[in-house]
């Protein structure tokens, strides 16, 4: 697995060869910006799912819904704030490595890449992946970091506003993953293989 700064551009020659070999292009957004915009409904749904989990795990959260209490938010920038920012990027990196860990032989493959472009992390591969495996790769960071991790943190006594925030950002940030899952689930027949070429996805 290698580090890259951004997802490679689509190679038109590779696209032509894939089509000639019987691969079918997936109908999908043309770039990440459009994908994020279209995935907003998933962002909201994922956020609600996590909020329900957090509501029952973290009692102080219930106070936000108590109309008899005044809500006061104070934000202070100091050294701890910068540590929080660093932890946020570490958490985002963990999200991407969880994607990668479910790609067969990802850490020894020269066809698997990861990176962070601005505030958006990504894992990219040109390996052929079965549909079922692709869906697992896509959903696992959400399940592990936004559904299972809060329970573990609660048991350990480490569940607080900041760890809740990290889990929430992971849940909402998984929206593009869920969009891709829906596109794959609807368009790709069972048992098919999937391959990426830049921002284009093909199946056969």
Model-derived segments and spans:
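Perimembrane loop-to-helix junctions flanking transmembrane segments
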Residues: 60-77
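Short acidic/polar alpha-helix capping motifs at helix-coil junctions
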Residues: 63-66, 87, 96, 100, ...
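Short pre-active-site segment immediately N-terminal to the catalytic Zn-binding motif
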Residues: 75-91
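Hydrophobic, membrane-facing alpha-helical anchors
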Residues: 89-94, 115-123
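Catalytic Zn2+-binding segment of zinc metalloproteases
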Residues: 99-112, 187
